[in-house]
Every structure is written in C-alpha cells, then in structure tokens.
Swiss-Prot record:
Residues 1-62 form the HTH asnC-type domain. Gene3D superfamilies: 3.30.70.920, Winged helix-like DNA-binding domain superfamily/Winged helix DNA-binding domain. The keyword Plastid does not apply. Keywords: Activator, DNA-binding, Repressor, Transcription, Transcription regulation. One of its GO terms (molecular function) is sequence-specific DNA binding. It holds the Pfam family AsnC_trans_reg. The gene is ptr2. SMART domains: HTH_ASNC. This is HTH-type transcriptional regulator Ptr2. It comes from Methanocaldococcus jannaschii (strain ATCC 43067 / DSM 2661 / JAL-1 / JCM 10045 / NBRC 100440). Residues 20-39 bind DNA. PANTHER family: LEUCINE-RESPONSIVE REGULATORY PROTEIN, TRANSCRIPTIONAL REGULATOR AZLB.
Length: 140
C-alpha cells in the first residue's frame, strides 16, 4: 500500500459514492488505475464494503446509546456473539478499558430501550454489569 492508496481510501471514507473518474481527476491519474487500486484494496480486505451513514432520528430511532458490558470472563465471547443477534444493536466491539464489550444500540424511545436492556439483553447469561450512555448530540 502506497501514498496513492491511502489518498484513495481517504476520499472514499469522505464520500463512498465518488466515481473513479472524479477520484482519478483529484489525484491526477487515470480512471483505470483507480479502478485497479480499489479492486485490490477490496480483495485485500482493506475496503470491507460501502454503506450509507444514517441519521437514526430521521427513521424513528430517537434513542442511541453507547453501552458498556462487563461479563464473567469465561462468558465474554458468548455474550459478544449474543449481542450481535439483536437488530437494535448496531455495533459490537470488544475492548480494553472500562468495559469488556462496547455497543451502539438504537431504540425508538426510552421505553423500548429500557425493555431491551432489562427484559432481553439483560437476560444474556454472563452479563455482570450494563452501563448505558445515551447520546445527546452527535458532533462528528
């Protein structure tokens, strides 16, 4: 991977819909060169896919929470896998720091979020502590 690949990645991270022609023009190279480089980055797993960035509130999700989970050590991976099964859990990360597992959870409202945490997720075997932090405003 060279400097040009890194610039292509940076451009696609800003706008995943940007055409190869526009990227080539911006970097002063040919469209076919960009096409080959992007294909190689995809094959190597550097580019894993393309997605839309959604404003949860515009589609009815008024509660977004970053939620930390502490687990029994021997249940750690099982808890992470179980969390992945919930459609409301949009992202699951294993981490160091304050919590063993961090998630991003979307809910329609506080009642739905509470029900999810206490009556569904909270019943996963091995969870010792749940620490939700509701997002007030996304700055970036």
């Amino acid at each position: 991977m060279d400097e040009k690949d890194l610039k292509i990645i940076e451009i696609l991270m800003r706008d995943g819909r940007k055409s190869y022609t526009d990227i080539a023009r911006e970097l002063g190279t040919s469209e076919s060169s960009i096409r080959k480089r992007v294909k190689k980055l995809e094959e190597e797993g550097v580019i894993k896919g393309y997605t839309a960035i959604i404003d949860p509130s515009k589609i009815g999700y008024n509660v977004v929470a970053l939620t930390g989970f502490d687990t029994e050590p021997d249940k750690f991976l099982n808890v992470a896998k179980e969390l992945c099964k919930f459609p409301e859990v949009k992202k699951v990360f294993t981490s160091t720091g304050d919590h063993m597992i961090m998630t991003e959870i979307w809910a329609k409202d506080g009642k739905e979020f509470s029900d999810l945490i206490f009556n569904k997720i909270g019943k996963i075997e091995g969870i010792k502590k749940i620490c939700p932090a509701i997002i007030l405003e996304q700055m970036k």
